[in-house]
Structure formats: structure tokens, C-alpha cells
């Protein structure tokens, strides 16, 4: 199932791999930035990859923070889909890439890890020197009073509030919806969203939606790590989201080398000292 979400790539070139390894190896304070591509081998699709990305394969569009806060229909669409996809997401396990970076950390092979992912797989693999730039989807937070509960606890509340909803879309014997399946228009109508247990406010997965401000403390940490590092390695990100791109651009403006591993173009290709269009696991196995 995991391979379903991994984009097609070209055959490995041993000389390119050796050169890449040699160049990255000269950086003693390496800042690593990971994106959705590092988790595709765990069965979690990315967004923009040709033929397999969620935004390229389906009619799915990102939900904007302002719409989420203003529109009940938008919140119903967000939570109904999250409810149906949660079992698959919750069961996702770290893959070779996550464990490799955890081992790199233990061996002091890099300075810091910034992930744009919200799947928590780096933490599950044992990473500790990490900033989850866009939050963590394994918990849910009130937008009014900062009350927090686990995503699984909230799933239980969603399940209780919406008896029979899952059975409309998930076939008997099937535990969850395919990650790239779009719900029919209007199917979210009537979906009930439990309120905050503390103040009755709106509950939202503890992730940064499009149009939402990033956590200022995390921004400061990332800026500090860029200043401290002397090179950047990006893994599995197109850097289309501005927050990730700005980190790389910040390092580039300081004349620090940029190394990229991503299947397909990225926003920072022109900045790259060297780029490989290979599967991340194939590269990390050689490093």
C-alpha cells in the first residue's frame, strides 16, 4: 500500500550518490528539513507529486483557517473527512527514513531537524532534536481556551456524535477510507462536531492551516537554527509552502550550501548546491 503513494523516479546513478554524500559530509552543522515526501513510504500521500499527490490526483483543496473559523459547512467538511481517514493515519508507522534520521541524531550527524509534517512519525521513530513547524495532528486544540485532548479521544467523541456516518462510506470489512478518496459533495451535511469540553469553543486539529499564523516560538527556533547551521539538507519537500521556503532562502542568503532530495521540482532548485531526484530511502541508505 505504501508504494501506491511514492512517485515514480529515475534509476539511481552511483556517481551522483557518491558526490552528494561527499558534499553533504563536509557540513558539520547540518540543518535538515523534511516534508510530506519522507512519509509516503509509510502510506501517507504527499500533496503535489505527479500522478500520486492528493492535490494532483483528486479534486481536494486545502482548507483555509479563515473559512474554518467562519463556516460551519467548512468545519463539517474538514472533520467528516478527518473522521473517516483517522484510522489509517493513526496506524501509520515510521519508515526507514524516519528511523535513519533518528539514528543520525544519536550519532550527532546533524544540528537540528525541522519537519513540515504533522504526522508525528519523526517523534515515533525517536527523534528529539526536532521542531514540528506546522504542528501535530495527533492532538486537538480549542481555538478559544487552549484546551487540548488527544486526536484519538476526539475521534471517540466524533464517533459517538455521528452514529452510522462511517458505514455510509466505508464498505463492510474495510476499516477506513483510502487516503486519496474524495467524499461526495454535500456528504458532510448533518455531521456533528463536538465542542470544547472546557468552554464550548471550536475544536481544531493542532496543526497550522493555510492562512493561519505560525507559532512565533517555533519561528524563532527555526531562525536560530538556520543561523547556527552551516548547510541545509531538504528531504521530500517541494517547498511550495512559504514557511519552509523562507527557511531555505534564509540559509541561502547567508551563502550556506543547500542540498535537496525530492522527486520532482522544488521552489529552491536554483539555490541548490546539488539536487537528487531519487527516493529518499535510496539516498539515505547510501549515507
UniProtKB/Swiss-Prot annotation:
Known catalytic reactions: N(6)-acetyl-L-lysyl-[protein] + NAD(+) + H2O = 2''-O-acetyl-ADP-D-ribose + nicotinamide + L-lysyl-[protein]
Keywords associated with the record: Metal-binding, Mitochondrion, NAD, Transferase, Zinc
Residues binding NAD(+): 35-55, 116-119, 236-238, 262-264, 280
PROSITE patterns: SIRTUIN
Active-site residues, record numbering mapped to chain: 134 (proton acceptor)
Tissue expression notes: Ubiquitously expressed with high expression in the pharynx, body wall muscles and gonad. Strong expression in a subset of non-neuronal cells in the head.
Annotated CDD domains: SIRT4 (cd01409)
SUPFAM superfamilies: DHS-like NAD/FAD-binding domain (SSF52467)
Cellular localization per UniProt: Mitochondrion matrix; Mitochondrion
Keyword Transferase: yes
UniProt EC number: 2.3.1.286
Domain Deacetylase sirtuin-type intervals: 10-287
Sequence positions that bind Zn(2+): 142, 145, 196, 199
Textual note on the cofactor: Binds 1 zinc ion per subunit.
Broad class of the protein's primary localization: mitochondrion
Cofactor(s) for this UniProt protein: Zn(2+)
GO cellular component terms, A-Z: mitochondrial matrix; mitochondrion
This protein's record includes keyword Metal-binding: yes
Function of the molecule: NAD-dependent protein deacylase. Catalyzes the NAD-dependent hydrolysis of acyl groups from lysine residues. Plays a role in oxidative stress resistance. Might promote neuronal cell death under ischemic conditions and cell death in touch neurons induced by mec-4 channel hyperactivation, possibly downstream of the insulin-like receptor daf-2. Might attenuate the reactive oxygen species (ROS) scavenging system, that eliminates ROS in ischemic conditions, under dietary deprivation and when glycolysis is blocked.
Other notes: This protein may be expected to contain an N-terminal transit peptide but none has been predicted.
Family per similarity comment: Belongs to the sirtuin family. Class II subfamily.
Subunit structure: Interacts with pyc-1, pcca-1 and mccc-1.
Stated name of the protein: NAD-dependent protein deacylase sir-2.3
Gene it is expressed from: sir-2.3
